[in-house]
Swiss-Prot record:
Catalytic activity reported: (2R,3S)-3-isopropylmalate = (2S)-2-isopropylmalate
Pathway in which this enzyme or protein is active: Amino-acid biosynthesis; L-leucine biosynthesis; L-leucine from 3-methyl-2-oxobutanoate: step 2/4
Protein name in UniProt: 3-isopropylmalate dehydratase large subunit
Function: Catalyzes the isomerization between 2-isopropylmalate and 3-isopropylmalate, via the formation of 2-isopropylmaleate.
Presence of the UniProt keyword Lyase in the record: yes
Cofactor: [4Fe-4S] cluster
Single annotated GO MF: metal ion binding
The protein's Enzyme Commission number: 4.2.1.33
Taxonomy of the source species: Bacteria, Pseudomonadati, Pseudomonadota, Betaproteobacteria, Neisseriales
Length: 469
């Protein structure tokens, strides 16, 4: 039998039918639903007189529009409130395996809530009307975002039409240095291959450095696969995966668990499996990263300087660099560790889990917010993450440092709720996109790890965390 990649196995196990041109009907195991991309899909079902094909495949929460402060005031923005209210109504009418509404303890960012509930399991196909659905590939699952029309198709038929991507292996060999996190690995990879480097591919991440990551670190890495242009990212199943899933609310139990684990252990690329493209990186080459421009690929080590467009020979790239520097208000040659920040945001589906908050708290402990930093928002990814952080006293560390301890939600990752930048504000952010206006009109976003964000909060500028005792 021909050796298969992990992607081959996941794909082949879910093909319902294949056409001559390679288009397939792909069966979907788990459908994650939130308030932004579902209203039109539910309306389409109503107009056609259809029901959900499989109610028990749907797990839902409200996240993009929910406020992260003053919950006693409810949702103030009328459009945001309308979207959340419509989701409440649609789930009540159509049903779901589980729904975590606004202000429920289980509510949170969909890509945080799903894994912590055990709704994401190895071997599954997972879709959501959100591009960062690639997060769930960390479990040895095939996960990717879909558009609103595909959300309706999944609801109505439990299938989507798709064509198989090419396969890519990105291996990071060796051990990561102290202070280097999964976020740094993700940004480094994107800096090396570019935001189009993974276009048309499904990426499997491997190598010693990847295997050493916790599940939360792997989720951060796979979350960023879409920023490298890939539709999906994944990590093979190992004991770390199995230990994380065990005893989660929706994980199999008893004999079903034993059978599931037996299957899950096969979800690795076979020896001799051939990938369409491979990259290998040395973990020791990776330093703490900071983006300087308006694309995740515009990223450098913290010890670097803002690049000079005049040194770029490609006229298209040079023009892009010039535009980015103008938007970001930066001068070529400025050391990254001399760039001051106005706002710090620690949260998002990339970096809002308990390990991320511990990482930030370790830097913030016994320190205070720098005088030039206007606000520091700490936004846990879910109510359960918030609860755990408070049990550990992390909230007190943040509050004593002068940071804001918020309620769960997508928050300042994107300007769809009350948390947003104003024109010209510079933000050290643990989110996934630094596009123009992503965090608010005219806002300037620098992507970093939680520890690097916390360091910027207490020093007032981008700082190498390895220099902080």
């Amino acid at each position: 039998m021909t050796a298969q990649t992990l992607y081959d196995k996941l794909w082949n196990n879910h093909v319902v039918r294949e056409e001559e041109d390679g288009t397939v009907l792909l069966y979907i195991d788990r459908h994650l639903v939130h308030e932004v991309t579902s209203p039109q899909a539910f309306e389409g079902l109503k107009m056609a007189g259809r029901k959900l094909w499989r109610i028990d495949s749907v797990v839902s929460t409200a996240d993009h529009n929910t406020p992260t402060g003053d919950w006693d005031k409810g949702i103030q923005d009328p459009i945001s409130k309308l979207q959340v209210d419509i989701l409440d109504k649609n789930i009540k009418e159509f049903g779901a395996l589980a729904y975590f509404p606004f202000m429920d303890k289980g509510q949170g960012i969909v890509h945080v809530m799903g894994p912590e509930q055990g709704a994401t399991l190895p071997g599954m196909t997972v879709v959501c009307g959100d591009s960062h659905t690639s997060t769930h590939g960390a479990f040895g699952a095939l996960a990717h975002g879909i558009g609103t029309s595909e959300v309706e198709h999944t609801m109505a038929t439990q299938c989507i039409t798709a064509k198989k991507s090419k396969s890519m292996l990105i291996a990071v060999d060796g051990k990561l240095k102290a202070g280097v996190t999964a976020k740094d690995v993700a940004l480094y990879i994107i800096g090396q291959i570019g935001t189009a480097g993974g276009t048309g591919y499904a990426i499997e991440f491997g190598g010693e450095a990847i295997r050493s990551l916790s599940m939360e670190g792997r989720m951060t890495l796979c979350n960023m696969a879409i920023e490298a242009g890939a539709r999906s990212g994944m990590v093979a199943v190992d004991q770390t995966t199995i230990d994380y899933v065990k005893d989660k609310p929706f994980a199999p139990k008893g004999e079903a668990w034993d059978k599931a684990v037996e299957y899950w252990r096969t979800l690795v690329s076979d020896e001799g499996a051939v990938f369409d493209k491979e990259y290998r990186f040395n973990a020791e080459d990776i330093e703490p990263q900071v983006t300087w421009g308006t694309s995740p690929e515009m990223v450098l080590d913290i010890s670097s300087k803002v690049p000079n467009p005049a040194e770029e020979t490609d006229p298209v790239k040079r023009s892009g660099m010039e535009r980015a520097l103008e938007y970001m208000g930066l001068e070529a040659g400025t050391p990254l560790n001399e760039i001051p920040v106005d706002i710090v945001f620690i949260g998002s589906c990339t970096n809002s889990r308990i390990e991320d908050l511990r990482e930030a708290a370790a830097i913030a402990k016994d320190r205070k917010k720098a005088a030039n930093v206007q606000r520091v928002l700490i936004v846990p990814g879910s109510g359960l993450v918030k609860e755990q952080a408070e049990k550990e006293g992390l909230d007190k560390i943040f509050i004593e440092a002068g940071f804001e301890w918020r309620e769960p939600g997508c928050s300042m990752c994107l300007a769809m709720n009350a948390d947003r930048l104003t024109p010209g504000q510079r933000c050290a952010s643990t989110s996934n996109r630094n596009f123009e206006g992503r965090q608010g009109n005219g806002g300037r976003t620098h992507l970093v790890s939680p520890a690097m964000a916390a360091a910027a909060a207490v020093t007032g500028r981008f700082t190498d965390i390895r220099m902080m005792a």
